[in-house]
Every structure is written in structure tokens, then in C-alpha cells.
Regions:
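Core of compact, soluble alpha-helical bundle domains
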Residues: 1-131
Length: 131
């Protein structure tokens, strides 16, 4: 079955899988982000497969992802807005190591747009209701 929409940019599913695997390997070793993820992720291969499906959906227009990243990050309880800069910096370094400059830039721009939305959701979720 072919996708109705073209990919956002030139990348393969295998390249997406590689980036996701390397990113989460780096996350697990990061002194600040590793513990945040460790509280929530008990099955890393399953988590990586889910996130790879998210990116294949967002980039390749494959329809295999079922989830709500905004709700997941809000519900986590230990995700702070300031973490997104570190998170995205780490992601960018993985992109640059594994992809062509143009593909890394295209994916980085998409990740930063999504990251801004996630950050706003976390910030909005931390504001107390005044009514």
C-alpha cells in the first residue's frame, strides 16, 4: 500500500530506526535525562519501536503510530520545560552524526517545532487553575 502523502524529506525507515536507537542509548547515559526516562520506561526496545513509529508517521506519513505525546509528557509529572533544550541538543547531535547535513537539518527543524509544542504543554500543565 502506498502512502497518500509524500515524505516530508528524504530519509529511510532504517535511518529513522537508527537515530531513535542511538538517541535513546544517549538518553540512558545522560545524567539529567536518564533518570527522568528511567522512571517511565521499563521496556526500552518497546519504547524505541513506538517512538520510531511516531517519527515514521511524522516524516514518512506511515500510519503505524497510535499515541498522544502531548498527554504523555504532561502526565509524566517529572518533565520540566527546561529539559527540552538539553533533550533537543542531544537529539541534534545524534542527527548530525548519522545523517546527511540536509536530512539532519530537516529533521531537526521538525523536532524543534514538536518540542516547542511539548514544552508549552508541560508549561501550561504546571500553571495552577485560578478559578
Amino acid at each position: 500500500m502506498t502512502n497518500a502523502l509524500p515524505p516530508r524529506f528524504d530519509i529511510t525507515a532504517d535511518e529513522i530506526d537508527l537515530v531513535v536507537a542511538e538517541f535513546y542509548a544517549a538518553i540512558r547515559h545522560h545524567p539529567g535525562l536518564g533518570p527522568v526516562f528511567a522512571v517511565h520506561v521499563t521496556d526500552w526496545p518497546e519504547h524505541e519501536a513506538k517512538i520510531a513509529r511516531f517519527w515514521r508517521n511524522a516524516i514518512l506519513m506511515e500510519r503505524g503510530y497510535d499515541g498522544n505525546p502531548f498527554a504523555a509528557h504532561q502526565a509524566a509529572g517529572n518533565v520540566r520545560a527546561a529539559m527540552f533544550d538539553v533533550w533537543l541538543g542531544l537529539f541534534d547531535s545524534v542527527l548530525k552524526r548519522n545523517l546527511s547535513a540536509q536530512t539532519a537539518q530537516s529533521w531537526s527543524e521538525l523536532a524543534h517545532r514538536i518540542g516547542r509544542g511539548l514544552r508549552m504543554g508541560v508549561e501550561a500543565g504546571s500553571v495552577p487553575g485560578l478559578r
